[in-house]
Amino acid sequence: MESETITIYDVAREAGVSMATVSRVVNGNQNVKETTRRKVLDVIERLDYRPNAVARGLASKKTTTVGVVIPDIANSYFASLARGIDDIATMYKYNIVIANSDGDDGKEINVVNTLLAKQVDGLVFLAHNLSDKIRAEFSRTRSPIVLAGAVDPEDQIPSVNIDYTVATKEVTLELAKNNQKIALVAGPMVNAINGKERLSGYQAALAEAGLTFSEGLVFETTYSYPAGLKLAERVKASGATAAVVTDDEVAVGLLNGLVNSGVNVPEDFEIITANNSVITEFTRPTLSSIEQP
């Protein structure tokens, strides 16, 4: 049997006050006598009244809800970003609604429209790439949009990111202290972060270190552990003795693949990865990583 929904009217009637008074108590308004406040709170507790968040949102023009679009909720990097967003949202008494897009352009648009239809106060869009379709969708909304994990090459949409060019240059220079052949293992180069920012940082570091750039040392792959594992033999065959890897799960796969093929890491092969997610602490040896915000 369905339980009857308790409304603000029920609380007001039971407490013998107006609905406006109940609303003031619920919203923490101090302009209520303490005896009245206590009486209303007692009724709220007894009836197990829970304010309707949707109705409150319509009245205040705010839902205190932030939508979060994530490309792969199983990916440790994006999962850690989502956790961080939730921690901050909780601090400010906001809720988050997470939708998984699977990194698919069509599904991204669907989940974005679904979240915006729920009148979220803003949207955090986590992705590897920003497609023209999703950019066009964002241009039509008045809701605040912030990117994380992706950058807008046109600098029209704000993002929370590091300087990928500088970071990649710094770690490549660090590896260049002990290595002559350094590989770059990156996600799809069509993504601006990889094909533009990280690649340019990698090339700049090689030039500064007096090393020759070779396309044969640039490996394009997908963002997954199996992809890194599969890539290990090719990286080994290239003659590289170090690698800058742009995804932690790929880095762990590469590490295990190299170890399985008899390579001693880090004695014979050094790896620096990019996201500093928790899985970098679980490997043996542990992986050095670029720190993300």
Residue ranges and their predicted role:
Residues Y49-T114, K118-G122, P188, L199-Q203:
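Amphipathic helical "hinge" segments at domain boundaries
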Residues M91-Y92, T141, L206-F213, K236-S238, ...:
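Short helix-capping segments at alpha-helix termini
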Residues G103, F125-E170, K177-K181, E249, ...:
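Flexible loop/hinge segments that line or gate small-molecule binding clefts
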Residues V120-L126, A183-A186, V218, K236-D247, ...:
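Periplasmic-binding protein-like
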Residues M1-T64:
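N-terminal helix-turn-helix DNA-binding module of bacterial transcription factors
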Residues P71-S80, I98-K107, V160-E170, V185-L231, ...:
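Hinge/beta->alpha junction and helix N-cap segments in small-molecule ligand-binding domains
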Residues A232-P293:
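Flexible loop/turn connectors
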